[in-house]
């Protein structure tokens, strides 16, 4: 069993590392980097890796610093700055994502978005907890957002230029663009919406933390074929994931019936 309370130490570490995102956004001339790589991403992951090894020394898979795998039952899975392309364009809403797998099962997740229009937001959970905690407070996710009707579906920032088309696909919910898939999933787990969607391939480091949070509230993540997404003991997907739909099961099942491929001809990224 995972040691009680380590999620609080992880959250403190993630918030500390997330301060680098804000500092980078405020640099004269904007963030350093191009395309899908920001220089600060590596700096953040180095801080996270060092701190996580002190909290629980085990295997590690990071987007920037690579893999350290020995066959340990636990494995940290880290994305230091999910939503880098939007971050480099000066848009807020990227997130630090730290998940922990126990023999391929998500058992801890911390997602921290330091610079959203709503302010900083940290959502976390670990196995054995009865509820999520958000910004230091225990929360009971709202049941009213578990269905699509009257709720929102979190989609990529590319949807901002095609709101009407996305709203049709999300109906009877409406769409809300967010750069980070990790943060989309975390907000769904916290009760802010019914589902989070990515129409482009994701990696385990993008979604393990959010998957843990969804698991805590009875949700799940499905691939483009409607199969529940699962991981190997080496922190890889069992099947290739081209798209993902995360949230309450019935909401995801409904969204999976929609013609999302039509958007790929309209949007540069999702």
Please name every model-derived segment.
Residues 42, 64, 80-83, 87, ...:
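Generic detector of well-ordered alpha-helical packing
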Residues 75-77, 86, 109, 196:
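Short glycine-aspartate micro-motif
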């Amino acid at each position: 069993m995972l040691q009680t309370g380590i999620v609080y130490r992880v959250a403190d570490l993630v918030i500390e590392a997330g301060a680098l995102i804000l500092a980078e956004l405020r640099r004269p001339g904007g963030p350093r980097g191009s395309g899908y790589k920001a220089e600060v991403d590596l700096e953040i992951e180095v801080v996270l890796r060092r701190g996580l090894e002190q909290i629980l020394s085990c295997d590690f898979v990071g987007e920037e610093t690579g893999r350290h795998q020995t066959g340990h039952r636990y494995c940290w899975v880290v994305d230091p700055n999910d939503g880098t392309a939007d971050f480099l364009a000066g848009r807020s809403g990227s997130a630090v994502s730290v998940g922990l797998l126990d023999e391929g099962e998500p058992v801890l997740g911390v997602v921290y978005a330091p610079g959203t229009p709503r302010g900083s937001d940290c959502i976390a959970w670990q196995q054995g907890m009865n509820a999520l905690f958000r910004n230091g407070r225990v929360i009971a996710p709202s049941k009213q957002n578990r269905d699509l009707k009257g709720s929102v579906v979190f989609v990529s920032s590319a949807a901002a230029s095609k709101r009407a088309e996305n709203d049709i696909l999300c109906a009877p919910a409406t769409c809300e663009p967010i750069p980070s898939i990790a943060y989309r999933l975390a907000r769904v787990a916290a009760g802010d919406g019914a589902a989070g969607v990515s129409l482009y391939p994701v990696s385990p480091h993008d979604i393990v933390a959010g998957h843990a949070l969804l698991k805590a509230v009875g949700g799940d993540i499905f691939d483009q074929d409607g199969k529940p997404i699962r991981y190997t003991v080496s922190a890889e997907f069992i099947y290739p994931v081209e798209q993902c739909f995360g949230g309450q099961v019935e909401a995801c099942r409904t969204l999976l019936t929609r013609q999302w491929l039509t958007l790929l001809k309209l949007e540069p990224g999702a």
